[in-house]
């Protein structure tokens, strides 16, 4: 039986890697430097997903909204701390490497498309997944608007030589479901990530899976 999809584009945070503790630690470190309120790890589940710029906006106190100088300083502090500590607690979700190798053995090509700064995303993929598994890693760069806008997804598709009809976008949040749909792709949500099944279904996910094995079977048409 032919695979249902020939290409898969994965989100990173909350999909392949559990990065939440390290993102929360960097956010709270920045807040503490300014004497601002901090947040629980669970509260950060709903602050991440749209890239580091939005994350910083979301943990800054409301009275600093529109304060460009405070924002730029906080962003620089966050990036510096996260850059040094992004691997403290981060790890692949259980079963992820095995799933990727199963797909790769079946001839599926896959890439990463994330709103995480490219300078952070690329080293994390290299460390936890090696340099051979992913055909392309695309983090946030100034040349493209962030997900869920379509241009960066279409760029990845072009680089892969992928057909929209046989390409699946996989992620853990409403942003990811929209990312796929905005580029004309089917979108699969993974319930093990930061947001959960209810958000994915409400966002209109074409599929929602609970395990890496379910995802592999979906992609392979088993």
Each model region followed by its residue ranges:
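Asp-based, Mg2+/Mn2+-dependent phosphohydrolase catalytic module
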Residues: 1-7, 104, 118, 122-222
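Short amphipathic alpha-helical segments and helix-helix/interface helices
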Residues: 97-100, 197
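Hydrophobic, well-ordered secondary-structure segments
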Residues: 30, 51, 77-88, 111, ...
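Conserved SAM-binding loop
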Residues: 16, 92, 110-113, 169-170, ...
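N-terminal helical cap/lid subdomain that shapes the substrate entry/recognition surface
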Residues: 2-98, 105-106, 119, 131
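Small/polar loops that bind or transfer phosphate-bearing groups
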Residues: 11, 19, 48, 112-113, ...
């Amino acid at each position: 039986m032919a695979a249902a999809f020939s290409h898969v584009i994965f989100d990173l945070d909350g999909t392949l890697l559990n990065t939440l503790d390290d993102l929360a630690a960097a956010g709270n470190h920045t807040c503490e430097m300014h004497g601002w309120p901090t947040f629980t790890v669970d509260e950060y589940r709903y602050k991440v997903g749209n890239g580091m710029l939005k994350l910083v906006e979301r943990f800054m106190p409301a009275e600093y909204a529109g304060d460009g100088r405070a924002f730029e300083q906080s962003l620089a502090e966050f990036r510096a701390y996260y850059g040094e500590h992004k691997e403290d607690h981060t790890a692949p979700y259980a079963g992820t490497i095995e799933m990727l190798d199963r797909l790769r053995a079946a001839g599926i090509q896959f890439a990463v498309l994330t709103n995480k700064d490219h300078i952070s995303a690329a080293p994390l993929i290299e460390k936890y997944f090696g340099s051979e598994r992913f055909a392309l890693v695309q983090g946030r760069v100034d040349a493209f608007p962030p997900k869920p806008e379509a241009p960066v997804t279409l760029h990845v598709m072009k680089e892969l030589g992928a057909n929209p009809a046989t390409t699946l976008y996989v992620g853990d949040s409403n942003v990811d479901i929209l990312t796929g749909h905005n580029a004309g792709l089917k979108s699969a949500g993974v319930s093990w990530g930061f947001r959960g099944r209810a958000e994915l279904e409400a966002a209109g996910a074409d599929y929602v899976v609970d395990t890496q094995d379910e995802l592999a079977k979906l992609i392979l048409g088993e």
